[in-house]
């Protein structure tokens, strides 16, 4: 290898040293100085791992003074190169730059530069890079992108709402599904889609204080969204880091009370430039035209500043039409400004609902009915569709569905309000109550008597709360170490029940963490019952482990003991037996408890066991819940309303459970009120809205498509390959679960999403739903997305060399495999990836420029190739450099046609889809005032920007592989 003083070389093994200069040569060794690091390296002349750096006409090079030059000619004299070309800063031509004056910090980023500089990657990295490009491009084009990554069951009505709302610009909607139908999941799905597509980057979630941790857990566990919880302490800390404390985080959860308590804090929230605001339990925002509540005004102020708003609420009609109007007014104050007008409009929707019912019934339509439909829809060319709907042809059903969609688009609040009911959604189990009346122990009787004397000045509410938990009254007098469990008959009953139902998974819920911990100790020590504990004092990871142990079929815990707060946000529908060791104070909490098991997807009827002590507040409450509200065996949408109306009477009965006079009348009145309200709700059901929210066959097809995608094995093969190359250890634990841990030889020292202790993953949705400690891996999971970013944002796998053993071709035949990427640069919120994600175009060229890619499929070809070590590869590249340059020029000439075809197709698709959406909404605007002006403006602006960005789309070489034919 001829070395000359002043020549520039690069190390094959330490490319981070930059450009080296030959500073000493003798008979056997050569010394290189690497100026960018100041280090020297001594190599053997005969076989040194270094590559000569030679640039070619067309390349851009940088001098050590920092100016750049486009090379036009290369001269060699006495082994040293001089580059002649035009300076890019002064446009001076004929400038000469000797190689000794090249910038030593030179980084080879183009694939061809890396290849010629000896920076040759392993063959498997090249294959991974191509697959990453291919799969990444395919995922963006999926119609349900953003809906597959969440750890949830594929429930059609939820997917329908999320698919519709998640793709809108700054959606402003009211999610009002009945309890247990998954409003939180729907909101999470919408957030996930908006964040993934770039439509939103900053999100604020405002919830009641008791639900903060539930939301935190749900967002992290189900959607891999890591929110920051802001309370007084966190807010004060963040004030040191930024003028506006909320600018320190992109995703924030806070309580409604926290938001409204301070004027300055509310101002900071309003100024924080959120893209989406989510408000849970929005039915608690009290409003009247004369006196809106402070809470309502706070949310109203925020809703004026935030483009997208999701309000989650209980049954809209539950608190009356005025309250319902108030929530719609938050979403669009221009549209919903007059309550009287709103009431009148609602009455006018009845004929539309009747028309939809008529179409769905499938009966022949009379001429009058056809005319009425034509008038309602108001489109000039509707006649053929009406005729098709009334025919006996195969198209009749789809024509009727299209007419239903058109009616729903044009009338009512279906664009801003989504509502599903249990009547309209199948798949819910029955609930069976088993009450167990137990005697009140003398120890408790004495403690209660003493407490009554000593606590005479306590309020009725405080006495009522005390009376619900006699074990705590006993401990107040006997001390925290008092062994109440030795005589409490509920403990004896629980042990007997568990030992006689060893094969059943049982969820036990009690109000306090201390009770759960004491019960675990008793069950373990007395009966050897395996019980996991779940309470608010545990970290999320500890709770995950407890939940996972409970979920294990054979060796897992038989019982999970949960505290009230600790169980928030967790669902255990693989269990169907529940024991309420005590009772919660209000019907909302009771429904929340039962909701841990009563979910869509529950395979068995739910058995609810309530052991209660006679002559205590528990005996009062169990009767009121069951006989007054029917709240154990059915969901109770009327519960809160009735609870508020009889609160004072109920508190008095709970505070003095021995005073039963008039209690039967109270229960009777509550039951009558419950039945009347329930009938009123049923009568007021908006069938039109339910049909729209449910999604019908379209939603079912969406769920089936995602289920099909779940079975795709490409992801598993790709992920394992990715983990291998990044350097992540994989340990198969069986049951479709794998443990990933960092190795000592990682591609990056700290891979995002992989902790030092490792993580458990699964590719199986069912396993992920049963095992909360296992992360559900999809194309949308941060682990895969971070892996794709790591590979594609750098130069991993961008240049390699392989040998093809093929005796049908002459030895030394060259092939060059080129991977071009066609892409457009644009702000993320334009969501350009819908039309033109970075798309790979593969070419396989011989020396004559023949493209063999169509005949030779990538994976088949890849299996026929053999790797070459870097040192040998560098020698081969140097030997054929001119030939490779010639083939690259042939590739550049050919790529334009393929790239232009992709760009034109993307332009046509974008123009067609965005123009159609704009035309549709403009037509609807004439008949449905729920189409917002700003939505139309945004779509028009988005269309223009998308088209401009696609006009500027281009292509670049992303990776190349040199293939040399051999017969050995």
From Swiss-Prot:
UniProt: ATP binding residues: 177-184
Enzyme nomenclature, EC number: 3.6.4.-
DEAH box, short sequence motif: residues: 280-283
Entry GO MF terms: ATP binding; ATP hydrolysis activity; bacterial-type RNA polymerase core enzyme binding; chromatin binding; DNA binding; helicase activity; nucleic acid binding; nucleosome array spacer activity
Domain spans labelled Helicase C-terminal: 490-662
SMART domains hit by this protein: DEXDc, HELICc
Gene Ontology biological process terms from the UniProt entry: positive regulation of DNA-templated transcription; positive regulation of transcription by RNA polymerase II
Boundaries of every Helicase ATP-binding domain copy: 164-334
InterPro entries: Helicase_ATP-bd, Helicase_C-like, Helicase_RapA, P-loop_NTPase, RapA_C, SNF2-like_sf, SNF2/RAD54-like_C, SNF2_N
Keyword vocabulary terms for this entry: Activator, ATP-binding, DNA-binding, Helicase, Hydrolase, Nucleotide-binding, Transcription, Transcription regulation
Gene Ontology CC entries for this record: cytoplasm
Subunit structure: Interacts with the RNAP. Has a higher affinity for the core RNAP than for the holoenzyme. Its ATPase activity is stimulated by binding to RNAP.
Family: Belongs to the SNF2/RAD54 helicase family. RapA subfamily.
HAMAP family documented for this protein: Helicase_RapA
Job description of the protein: Transcription regulator that activates transcription by stimulating RNA polymerase (RNAP) recycling in case of stress conditions such as supercoiled DNA or high salt concentrations. Probably acts by releasing the RNAP, when it is trapped or immobilized on tightly supercoiled DNA. Does not activate transcription on linear DNA. Probably not involved in DNA repair.
Protein name: RNA polymerase-associated protein RapA
Biological source species: Escherichia coli (strain K12)
């Amino acid at each position: 290898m001829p070395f000359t003083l002043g020549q520039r070389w690069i190390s094959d093994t330490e490319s981070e040293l930059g450009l080296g200069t030959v500073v000493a040569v003798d008979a056997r060794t050569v010394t290189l100085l690497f100026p960018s690091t100041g280090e020297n390296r001594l190599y053997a002349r005969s076989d040194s791992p270094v590559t000569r750096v030679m640039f070619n006409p067309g390349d851009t090079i940088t001098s050590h003074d920092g100016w750049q030059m486009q090379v036009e000619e290369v001269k060699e004299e006495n082994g040293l190169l001089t580059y002649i070309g035009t300076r890019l800063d002064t446009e001076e031509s004929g400038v000469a730059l000797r190689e000794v004056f090249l910038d030593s910090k030179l980084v080879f980023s183009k694939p061809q530069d890396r290849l010629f500089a000896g920076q040759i990657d392993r063959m498997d990295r090249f294959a991974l890079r191509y697959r990453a490009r291919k799969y990444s491009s395919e995922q963006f084009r999926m119609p349900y992108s953003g809906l597959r990554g969440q750890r949830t069951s594929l429930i059609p009505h939820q997917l329908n709402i999320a698919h519709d709302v998640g793709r809108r610009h700054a959606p402003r909607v009211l999610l009002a599904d009945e309890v247990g139908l998954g409003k939180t999941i729907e909101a999470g799905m919408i957030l996930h889609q908006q964040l993934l597509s770039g439509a939103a980057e900053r999100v604020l979630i405002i919830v009641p204080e008791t639900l903060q941790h539930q939301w935190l857990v749900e967002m992290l566990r189900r959607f891999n969204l890591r929110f920051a919880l802001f309370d007084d302490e966190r807010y004060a800390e963040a004030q040191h880091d930024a003028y506006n404390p909320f600018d320190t985080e992109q995703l924030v959860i806070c309580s409604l009370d926290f938001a409204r308590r301070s004027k300055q804090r509310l101002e900071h929230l309003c100024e924080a430039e959120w893209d989406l605001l989510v408000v849970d339990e929005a039915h608690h925002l009290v409003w009247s035209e004369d006196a809106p509540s402070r809470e309502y005004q706070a949310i109203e102020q925020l809703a004026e500043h935030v483009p997208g708003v999701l309000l989650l609420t209980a049954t809209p009609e539950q608190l009356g039409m005025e309250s319902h109007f108030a929530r719609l007014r938050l979403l669009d104050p221009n549209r919903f400004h007059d309550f009287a007008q709103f009431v009148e409009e609602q009455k006018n929707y009845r004929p539309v609902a009747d028309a939809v019912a008529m179409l769905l019934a499938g009966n022949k339509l009379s001429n009058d009915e056809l005319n009425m439909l034509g008038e309602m829809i108001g489109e000039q060319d509707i006649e053929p569709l009406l005729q098709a709907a009334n025919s006996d042809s195969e198209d009749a059903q789809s024509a009727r569905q299209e007419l239903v969609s058109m009616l729903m688009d044009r009338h009512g609040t279906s664009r801003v309000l989504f509502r599903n009911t249990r009547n309209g959604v199948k798949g819910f189990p029955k609930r069976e109550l088993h009450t167990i009346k137990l005697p009140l122990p003398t120890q408790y009787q004495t403690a209660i008597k003493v407490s009554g004397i000593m606590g005479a000045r306590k309020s009725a509410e405080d006495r009522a709360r005390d009376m619900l938990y006699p074990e705590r009254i006993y401990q107040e007098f006997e001390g925290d170490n008092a062994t109440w469990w030795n005589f409490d008959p509920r403990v004896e009953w629980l042990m007997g029940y568990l030992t006689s139902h060893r094969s059943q998974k049982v969820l036990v819920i009690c109000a306090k963490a201390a009770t759960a911990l004491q019960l675990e100790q008793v069950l373990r020590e007395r009966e050897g019952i395996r019980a996991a504990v779940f309470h608010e004092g545990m970290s999320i990871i500890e709770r995950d482990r407890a939940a996972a142990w409970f979920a294990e079929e054979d060796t897992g815990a038989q019982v999970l003991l949960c505290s009230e707060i600790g169980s928030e946000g967790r669902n255990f529908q693989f269990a169907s037996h529940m024991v309420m060791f005590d009772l919660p104070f209000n019907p909302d909490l009771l429904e929340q408890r039962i909701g841990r098991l009563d979910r869509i997807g529950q395979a068995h009827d739910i058995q609810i066991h309530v052991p209660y002590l006679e002559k205590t507040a528990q005996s009062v409450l169990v009767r009121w819940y069951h006989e007054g509200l029917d709240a154990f065996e059915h969901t109770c949408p009327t519960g809160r309303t009735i609870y508020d109306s009889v609160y004072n009477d109920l508190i008095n009965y709970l505070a003095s459970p021995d005073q039963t006079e008039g209690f039967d009348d109270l229960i009777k009145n509550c039951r009558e009120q419950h039945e009347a309200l329930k009938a009123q709700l049923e009568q007021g059901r908006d069938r039109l809205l339910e049909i729209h929210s449910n999604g019908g066959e379209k939603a079912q097809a969406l769920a089936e498509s995602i289920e099909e995608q779940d079975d795709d094995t490409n992801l598993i093969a790709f992920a394992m390959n990715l983990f291998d190359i990044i350097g992540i250890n994989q340990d198969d634990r069986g049951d479709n679960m794998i443990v990933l841990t960092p190795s000592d030889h990682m591609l990056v020292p700290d891979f995002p999403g992989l902790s030092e202790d490792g993580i458990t993953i699964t590719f199986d949705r069912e396993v992920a739903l049963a095992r909360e400690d296992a992360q559900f891996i999809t194309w949308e999971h941060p682990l895969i997305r971070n892996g794709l970013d790591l590979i594609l944002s750098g130069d991993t796998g961008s240049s390699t060399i392989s040998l093809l053993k093929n005796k049908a071709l002459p030895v030394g035949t060259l092939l060059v495999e080129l991977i071009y990427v066609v892409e457009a640069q644009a702000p993320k919120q334009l969501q350009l990836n819908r039309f033109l994600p970075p798309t790979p175009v593969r070419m396989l060229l011989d020396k004559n420029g023949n493209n063999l890619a169509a005949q030779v499929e990538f994976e088949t070809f890849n299996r026929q190739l053999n790797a070459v070590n870097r040192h040998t590869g560098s020698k081969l590249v140097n030997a054929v450099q001119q030939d490779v340059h010639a083939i690259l020029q042939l590739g550049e000439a050919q790529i334009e046609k393929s790239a232009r075809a992709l760009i034109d197709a993307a332009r046509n698709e974008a123009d067609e889809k965005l123009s159609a959406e704009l035309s549709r909404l403009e037509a609807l605007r004439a008949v449905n005032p729920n189409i917002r002006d700003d939505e139309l403006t945004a779509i028009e602006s988005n269309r223009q920007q998308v088209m401009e960005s696609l006009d500027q789309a281009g292509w670049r070489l992303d990776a190349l592989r040199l293939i040399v034919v051999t017969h050995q």
